[in-house]
Amino acid sequence: MEAGADLGLRPTGGGVYGTSGRIEKGYRLMGAELESEYNPVEAGLARPKVKAADFIGKEAYLKAREAGNEVSMCTLTVESHTDSNGVERYMQGGNEPILTMDGERITDSHGRVSRVTTAGPGPSVGKYLLLAYLPNELAVVGTDLQVMYMNELFPVKVAAIEGSAFDPEDSRLKG
């Protein structure tokens, strides 16, 4: 490690790829953000063009593109981890419901409940991050919401929509 220090060599672990780095960049994961409940357009994966050749799912994909999305994949920041007993709690990211500041469950017109799909630290942004689908009317940077975790409400804020909380222009990746 010492020999590569001047080249920026540093230790990394699987958590960078599986959680923290993925969440900071807003990358979706099969089985968490990418699941049958949401189509590719809603997941923010629509491409500018659709190839002319036929492919499995093309008809459904074109139908979803035409309908547009009523939800967006968002990155949320946890504003406080302290529960009512003064204990810090860190969400694990698995179906915690997202509520309005009035305590109302958030659902879309299909009855899908907004929930946390992934949670983890975002060391590059200095915040604990969550990924979640939100109806477009709430998918606005700066919107304050709450997450129910262990029967406690924790304040969260929308930080990014269909993008990343860290390096949204991908300038670091592009060099």
Task: Give the residues covered by each predicted segment.
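Conserved, structured C-terminal
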Residues: 1-175
